[in-house]
């Protein structure tokens, strides 16, 4: 089970709600993924009409919603978005995202740490999206974050685990769940993240942009489960040189060769 704060999840695949062609496709994909923790941007929620045509169906599915602060450019804006999420949705769970650069959407480490400390002190369950920076992730754990969400590669890029070396260090050092977020573009990449020991992965673009989001979501679910089982089973060591799987000595010793030669000669005679 994946444990975040006081909540347990049987699925280790988190999904997002953006970039789908329509709401029905999104809902079908989320259902197919088996995801129990779904992110959504606060800026996409519209309650002015009495109900929201995105929020309602998600709530009816029984998934836990993880509002995010996407669009925030600094700590002040992110804190405001988190407080708004609490007022609108009644949850103190928040995926903290602060990326002032609209081109590459790189998270701002300084503003993220400032906002995380403030929100943790206010009792929020903070899950920050950050660079794959082991030092920063340690600091975020120290201020009380419930999990850290280091990127594999830029958001929406489908480039995979470009930061694998640093992700490994973060996973090794962390005492809270490490959820690989951003850039995962194929089920094999999600599987690899889980094999490394990640607690979970978050996938959005790779599912939403595929030709068949519902089927792709199921593929990711299977890959995440397989990767987790492989991690628990214990992967074999990686070596720089060959190791024979069968003995290379003994059967070619002089007595063996002599016996073989006699056998061949007797049959030939």
From Swiss-Prot:
A Pfam family of this chain: ThiG
Name a GO CC annotation attached to this entry.
cytoplasm
Q: What is its EC number?
A: 2.8.1.10
**What keywords does the record list, in alphabetical order?**
Cytoplasm, Schiff base, Thiamine biosynthesis, Transferase
Subcellular localization:
Cytoplasm
Q: Which InterPro entries match?
A: Aldolase_TIM, Thiazole_synthase_ThiG, ThiG
Swiss-Prot/TrEMBL catalytic activity: [ThiS sulfur-carrier protein]-C-terminal-Gly-aminoethanethioate + 2-iminoacetate + 1-deoxy-D-xylulose 5-phosphate = [ThiS sulfur-carrier protein]-C-terminal Gly-Gly + 2-[(2R,5Z)-2-carboxy-4-methylthiazol-5(2H)-ylidene]ethyl phosphate + 2 H2O + H(+)
- GO terms under biological process: thiamine diphosphate biosynthetic process
Q: Tell me the pathway.
A: Cofactor biosynthesis; thiamine diphosphate biosynthesis
Name the CDD domains on file.
ThiG (cd04728)
Catalytic residues (positions): 95 (schiff-base intermediate with dxp)
Give any GO molecular function from the UniProt entry. thiazole synthase activity
**Residues reported in the UniProt entry to bind 1-deoxy-D-xylulose 5-phosphate:** 156, 182-183, 204-205
Q: Which HAMAP family would you find in this protein's record?
A: ThiG
Q: How does it assemble?
A: Homotetramer. Forms heterodimers with either ThiH or ThiS.
Instruction: Give the family this protein belongs to, as stated in its UniProt record.
Output: Belongs to the ThiG family.
**PANTHER family membership:** THIAZOLE SYNTHASE
Q: What is this protein called?
A: Thiazole synthase
Please name the source species.
Shewanella frigidimarina (strain NCIMB 400)
* Gene giving rise to this polypeptide: thiG
């Amino acid at each position: 089970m994946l444990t975040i704060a006081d909540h347990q999840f049987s699925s280790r695949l988190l999904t997002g709600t953006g970039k789908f062609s329509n709401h029905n496709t999104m809902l079908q994909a989320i259902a197919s993924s088996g995801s129990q923790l779904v992110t959504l941007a606060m800026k996409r929620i519209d309650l002015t009409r009495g109900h929201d045509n995105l929020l309602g169906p998600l709530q009816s599915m029984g998934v836990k919603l993880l509002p995010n602060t996407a669009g925030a450019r600094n700590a002040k804006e992110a804190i405001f978005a988190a407080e708004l999420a609490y007022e609108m949705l009644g949850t103190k769970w928040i995926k903290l995202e602060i990326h002032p650069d609209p081109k590459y959407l790189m998270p701002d480490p300084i503003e993220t740490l400032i906002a995380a400390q403030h929100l943790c002190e206010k009792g929020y369950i903070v899950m920050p999206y950050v660079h794959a920076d082991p030092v920063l992730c340690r600091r975020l754990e120290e201020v009380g974050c419930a999990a850290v969400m280091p990127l594999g590669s830029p958001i929406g890029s489908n480039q995979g685990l470009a930061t694998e070396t640093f992700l490994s260090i973060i996973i090794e050092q962390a005492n809270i769940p490490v959820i690989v977020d951003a850039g995962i573009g194929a089920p094999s990449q999600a599987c690899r993240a889980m094999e490394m020991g990640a607690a979970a992965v978050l996938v959005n673009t790779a599912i939403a942009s595929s030709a068949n989001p519902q089927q792709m979501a199921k593929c990711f679910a299977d890959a995440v489960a397989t990767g987790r089982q492989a991690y628990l089973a214990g992967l074999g060591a990686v070596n720089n040189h060959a190791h024979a799987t069968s003995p290379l000595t003994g059967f070619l010793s002089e007595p063996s060769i002599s016996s073989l030669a006699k056998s061949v000669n007797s049959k030939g005679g």
